[in-house]
Amino acid sequence: DLLKEALRNDAATGNYSHLVVAIMGWRTPQEEAIRNFNSLARGMHLAAKGDFRPLFVGITWVGPWASRWLDPLIEAFAYARIAELADTLGLTWVGVIADEIALPMSASLPTIFITHSFGTRAATTALCIGPAIRRDAGSPLVRPPGAIDRLFGFQPAFSLQRFKKDRLIFFYEDVYFPNDCDRVKSIVLTTSRHDKATRAILWADLAGNYRYFRSFCRGNSGRLVSCTSVDATGAIEGTYDESMKVLYLDATKLVRFEAPGTDGGSHSDIFRPPVGRFIWNLIAAPPPGVSRSAPAK
């Protein structure tokens, strides 16, 4: 309640252009996550030239086996527990923050989620399904008003099969997002040929896996998703269908370096200025079905 009141009071001042909720992936300690939040916000601020004044909410979490020294093979076998934990976060406290803060405030401020890896899994579960808990068990379940403008999922650790009603053949993805995830206007996902972390998981078809991107887009582009690519400067290459809920991007040219102190190839290369420019280019434009005649004041 204190967080909710503080954010509403801040938003009422009119000093902010956007509400940003960010959540990083597994093995991101709080200190590192805060540095990452600062890097993302700085990159967007530089690209926006003064038009980006965020009211920023950063969510940090660390799963079990989070030490950096763990062998990648052990990390792969930890997938089941981390996947379940991320879904549980989405069904609990991340879902509560979405329902009680982000969605209601989206009526007055353009609202975006910036997420990475298992953080994308938690955020999509929170927004596309909603919380399974209520703080006031005696009150009726009321669907909150509002919708998130855009959710960015960098190198996401969840499957796009969650948007389909088909029988699932992979473990840990037996979740369906109902109503076409109508609480989010646009979902933007990236993959990269240089990401070794999502490639290592063979028993789940992760959206961050480049091989999965190629196969999924061959069969579903123009139906569930619009598939294209983004260049090294953060500019989207070619054309895409803006009416599609999911924009699925080959970010091989953008997400290509190994960030210091990380492993998994380029899995964590999302904090450089071109990435901030990429995010800003999309949030500066209205999401599907929305006409915005003037920038937020």
Can you name each region flagged by the protein language model?
Residues 3-8, 34-41, 91, 95-98, ...:
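Extracytoplasmic/secreted envelope proteins and their assembly/folding machinery
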Residues 6-68:
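Short, surface-exposed "cap/lid" segments of acyl-processing enzymes
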Residues 10, 122, 126-130:
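Short, low-complexity, polybasic intrinsically disordered segments
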Residues 17, 30-35, 80-92, 117:
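Soluble non-cytosolic domains of exported or imported proteins
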Residues 22-23, 114, 190:
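Short hydrophobic segments within beta-strands
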Residues 51, 61-109, 127-297:
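Lipolytic serine-hydrolase domain surface
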Residues 114-119, 123:
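Gly/Ala-rich beta-loop-alpha elbow adjacent to hydrolase catalytic centers
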